[in-house]
Amino acid sequence: MFEFTAASQDDFERLVVLRIATMRESLERIGRFDEQRARERFRGSFKPSQTRLIMVDGALAGCVALGPHDAGLLLEHFYIAPAEQGRGLGSAVLLRLLAEAAASGLPVRLGVLRASDAERFYRRHGFVMTGEVEWDIYYEWRPHP
């Protein structure tokens, strides 16, 4: 269904375009869309060594960044191209990542934009809310013992 390939610094531009396409609707809904800010935030947090491209039939379908953070893992970026959404790809990718985390016995933490579709997606996959601030909600998933 999909395969991961390693990202490089050369992937920055196409991944920031993917980020903007994926988040635009949610950001516009709350009056927070600013293309330049979205680009700058991604530039400040893009770590190619922790980023995997999600490829479907040889084409970029998304990306995910998962790396060590405190005593667990931080899922910092997870974007599925709008044309690929609604087909189970996001769930398949997340389930693979959670299996990797479970094999290591590590929790996975993340933050999502308030009122985005991502909130429901992560709750459906066993994440529980751990905190919130003005625009973001924080979640954690823990492996079963």
Task: Give each language-model segment a name.
Residues 3-17:
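A short beta-loop-alpha structural element at the N-terminal edge
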Residues 17-43:
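Conserved GNAT-fold acetyl-CoA-binding loop/helix
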Residues 42, 122, 127:
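Conserved active-site tyrosine of GNAT-family acetyltransferases
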Residues 43-53, 62:
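A short helix-loop-beta-strand connector motif used in the catalytic cores of GNAT acetyltransferases and
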Residues 59-67, 74-79:
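Conserved beta-strand in the GNAT
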Residues 72, 101-114:
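Conserved GNAT acetyl-CoA-binding A-motif
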Residues 80, 86-99, 123-124:
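Conserved acetyl-CoA-binding loop-helix of GNAT-fold acetyltransferases
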Residues 85, 109-120, 132-143:
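Conserved beta-strand-loop-alpha-helix junction that forms the acyl-donor binding cleft
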